Design a protein with these regions (language model features):
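Aromatic-rich carbohydrate-recognition surfaces in CAZymes
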Residues: 71, 353-358, 362-373, 377-477, ...
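Short strand-turn-strand beta-turns centered on an Asx-Gly dipeptide
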Residues: 769-773
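Active-site acid/base region of carbohydrate-active enzymes
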Residues: 84, 93-96, 315-326, 371, ...
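Carbohydrate-binding/catalytic loop surfaces
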Residues: 343-352, 393-421, 452-458, 477-499, ...
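Inter-helical turn/loop segments and adjacent helix faces that build the functional surface
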Residues: 137-143, 276-280, 438-452, 510-527, ...
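Surface beta-strand/loop "capping" patches
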Residues: 722-753
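Anionic coordination/interaction segments
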Residues: 1-356, 370-379, 383, 434-439, ...
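Catalytic cores of carbohydrate-active enzymes
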Residues: 149-151, 166, 391-392, 505-622, ...
Length: 795
């Protein structure tokens, strides 16, 4: 069933049926103030941290509530409804609604009983408060009197676990006050710092554009003994002007609109963590409500559409266009900002950045905003320990040069991460390379950056120490040890077990460093010898003719042998053998074909097969999951991006695009009940063929899938591959395509690219025509590019 459609011109996803299989969400705000809102106005808000800065309460794993609720009441009849379908949930044959999720804003338009409402939710650029503008229009030919209620359920404590669990304490530290047109909540804790370093917490919920007629700061008074669909205050037609003192706080404000026939009026609810003086200043800002809100919304749209304009494509597949031009890109920015911190699935327990997650997330925006990417990349380099490993969790309060590490009990106790992971620092190599290649800024390699615990070094030195960490943590076969994890958090191989996946990552890193250190002949010689030795081990110990094994247990037993009854075929070693250029052309063809035959489904490639049921070992923690789920034979979506890239690198355009289409959210827009989560954002995994719910996706928005699929599509399918010398354009596309166009900004220069595929090839173009001059396909040196360029790629 279809619940909505892509409006690519507006860069919006439009939900026409609000009764979706799961809450379909959008993200608002910035790193300083974040908000999640669904098509039914569910969701929550937080300052800096979803764990330690929670403002709005949200109850996870239930029915998408509470949220940002606006209720409308006909004062003549007493009938009432909500501006979004839920929480009141009027019958959809009489209640018409449409939700437009845009780039950092959401608007819900509804009609009921001759009244049209528009609820616009957004966080202004650079602000740390949110706006809920509500406009109400009388569509009838008679006067109407409409009561409007805004409801925000405030947390009793910024740490969400304290708010939801430690109620014997938190319900007795909060109280509310009413000031001129706003409710103020006070939390009497001054001994714990806020995420921004201040102490004490005050929140406000205010009304601009209308006069408050009644209010309450007590949840129990607003709801009564009912639920959100029938609040007692709305039934009564007003709040009782009571305030909270020991209990559950809320902000509830009511006002009345008198509308003539065809008349429209508007107001706005405002929410933030502010003192009374700051709240008054914000309230004054909206004295000219309509002009201010319109200006702020347009500023948001200009910013985000400007960010997305740095790459624009037009292909024969409109779902592909919608994902690459808008939704995959916007999701990449969202994961870049919030990592895995706060969603409707990630409850906010992680109070920081996962190292591997964030370094990979940076790659997803590199082609759109490389300088923003650089800022976060520099931050993550400063979270690298002096011996080369990355901190598994980088705290929001990270203080480079002064951090504890997994070698310290205090770090383990605070973060829950007991050891280093084999892959963390190796993700720096593709990410640093992508930055240098996208910008041409080789001087970045000489920038001095502190390490997390002690010492400083250039970016180049940071990378050298990452290689050294891998080389000093080798297993019995001379391959990198798997340590506490090797990207797959369910594969714990320790100091003696070895990872083929990480070995190919290391091989990739060694070859990148040869380019970065070309003026250091002795070090380049070491890199060459090390890479040659490692590749020899991989071919002699890990290649079984049609596949690379997954690695070795600490007992020396093989993981992922073709002779194994379970877990005999794994995806990532095959993809990374190709991406790292470790596989020969002949090997690449064979191993990719084996992956296709053994792992592919209508919904994407399964991570490994057959799933573990009986033959697992102690380090194979994926056995905890049901077969066909997550790392145990599920379609883990992040590796789909690597598979897309691998197929594209060998010129398999048909299969690269097949893999994109099979797991793409947009492919399920007409079959949304199967996929369940949003058809405009990637999920973490899809249930595999062993599940009775094959094709169902989970863990929306905050996932590394966003960046890997973006890279796979941009560098692989579209073939846009910046190098340190210039840019290569080598598409790998469906042979049936006649061609497509792209517009890209590269090092400040505009590229207008037309791909001509009248020969109906899958990949490997024959030649380019650059500004009227023919040249062989390959890298276009930067010095050959004008400020504005027309490039024709002949396949």
């Amino acid at each position: 069933m279809q619940y909505g459609y892509f409006d690519e011109k507006a860069r919006e996803y439009v939900i026409t049926n609000p009764n979706t299989p799961a809450p379909w969400a959008n993200y608002l705000g910035s790193p300083d103030y974040g908000a999640i809102v669904t098509q039914n106005a569910g969701g929550y808000s937080f300052v800096k941290s979803g764990a330690a800065g929670r403002i709005l309460r949200y109850t996870f794993n239930q029915f998408d509530e509470p949220g940002r609720y606006i209720y409308l009441r006909d004062e003549e009849t007493g009938d009432f409804w909500s501006a979004s379908w839920k929480p009141v949930a009027k019958p959809l044959d009489t209640f018409k609604t449409e939700t437009r999720h845009g780039t950092s804003y959401t608007e819900i338009v509804s009609e009921y009983d001759g009244i049209r409402s528009k609820a616009l939710y957004y966080v202004p650029m650079g602000a740390t408060h949110e706006v809920w503008r509500i406009s109400v229009e009388n569509l009838t030919d008679r006067p109407r009197k409409i009561g409007v209620f805004g409801y925000a359920e405030l947390t009793t404590e910024s740490f969400y676990t304290q708010d939801l669990v430690n109620m014997q304490y938190t319900q007795f530290i909060t109280k509310t006050e009413f000031h001129d047109n706003f409710i103020l909540e006070q939390i009497n804790e001054f001994n714990y710092p806020n995420p921004d370093g201040t102490t004490g917490r005050e929140r406000f919920f205010g009304l601009a554009g209308a006069k408050v007629a009644s209010y309450t700061g007590r949840r129990e008074q607003f709801l009564g003994r009912n639920r959100f669909d029938k609040p007692q205050a709305v039934l009564d037609g007003k709040c009782d002007d009571s305030l909270n003192y020991n209990g559950n706080p809320c902000g509830a404000l009511q006002f009345t609109l008198e509308l003539g026939a065809g008349e429209k009026k508007e107001a706005a609810f405002l929410l933030g963590q502010k003192t009374v003086f700051e709240a008054k200043k914000i309230m004054d800002r909206y004295a000219d409500l309509s002009a201010t809100v319109d200006s702020e919304l347009q500023e948001l749209i200009r910013y985000w559409h400007g960010e997305l304009e740095n790459l624009k494509i037009c292909t024969p597949d409109k779902n592909f266009d919608a994902m690459i031009n808008t939704w995959n890109a916007f999701q990449c920015f969202t994961t870049f900002v919030w990592s895995r911190a706060a969603s409707l699935i990630y409850c906010g327990e992680r109070n920081g950045y996962g190292y591997r997650d964030t370094v990979q997330d940076i790659q997803g925006i590199m082609h759109l905003d490389p300088e923003l990417a650089r800022k976060q990349l520099t931050f993550m380099l400063s979270a690298q320990v002096h011996h080369g490993a990355g901190l598994p969790l980088v705290k929001y309060s990270h203080n480079a040069g002064h951090e504890n590490t997994p070698d310290d009990d205090s770090y383990v106790k605070e973060t829950g991460h007991p050891s280093y992971r084999a892959d963390d620092a190796l993700w720096l190599f593709p990410t640093v390379y992508k930055y240098v290649a996208e910008t041409g800024n080789t001087a970045y390699l000489d920038e001095e950056i502190p390490f997390a615990d002690k010492d400083t070094g250039t970016v180049r030195e940071h990378l050298k120490r990452a290689i050294n960490f891998s080389m000093t943590h080798l297993g019995p076969h001379g391959m990198p040890a798997g340590l506490h994890a090797d990207w797959n958090d369910c594969l714990v191989l320790g100091s003696q077990g070895e990872s083929t996946f990480v070995a190919f990552q290391l091989y990739y890193a060694l070859n990148i460093m040869k380019e970065f250190c070309e003026n250091e002949p002795e070090y380049v010689k070491y890199l060459d010898e090390t890479a040659e030795k490692l590749l020899k081990i991989l071919n002699e110990k890990c290649f079984e003719g049609d596949r690379f094994i997954r690695g070795f247990r600490d007992t020396g037993d093989i993981i992922g042998s073709k002779n194994d009854r379970e877990a005999s075929m794994w995806l990532n070693p095959q993809s990374w053998a190709v991406i790292s250029r470790g596989a020969t052309p002949e090997q690449a063809e064979v191993i990719l074909q084996t992956a296709y035959e053994k792992l592919n489904t209508p919904y994407g490639l399964e991570l490994m097969q057959p799933s573990y049921r009986y033959d697992y070992f102690e380090g194979a923690r994926m056995r905890l999951f049901n077969p066909g789920t997550k790392e145990n034979g599920g379609i883990f979506c992040q590796p789909q991006g690597w598979a897309i890239l691998a197929e594209a690198l060998v010129g398999h355009g048909n299969r690269a695009f097949q893999y994109f289409r099979e797991s793409s959210p947009a492919s399920f827009n007409d079959d949304a009940d199967r996929r369940v989560i949003e058809p405009y954002v990637h999920g973490q995994f899809i249930e595999g063929h062993e599940s009775p719910f094959a094709g169902r996706s989970h863990v929306h928005w905050l996932t590394g899938t966003a960046s890997t699929v973006m890279v796979g599509c941009v560098e692989g399918i579209l073939g846009l591959r910046p190098t340190t010398k210039g840019i290569e354009i080598s598409p790998a596309i469906p042979a049936e395509w006649d061609g497509f166009t792209m517009e890209k900004v590269f090092r400040g220069k505009k590229l207008h690219i037309t791909v001509n595929n009248l020969a109906h090839k899958e990949g490997k173009p024959e030649k380019y025509i650059l500004n009227g001059q023919e040249m062989p396909a390959g890298v276009i040196p930067e010095e050959m590019l004008a400020e504005d360029n027309k490039i024709v790629v002949i396949m």
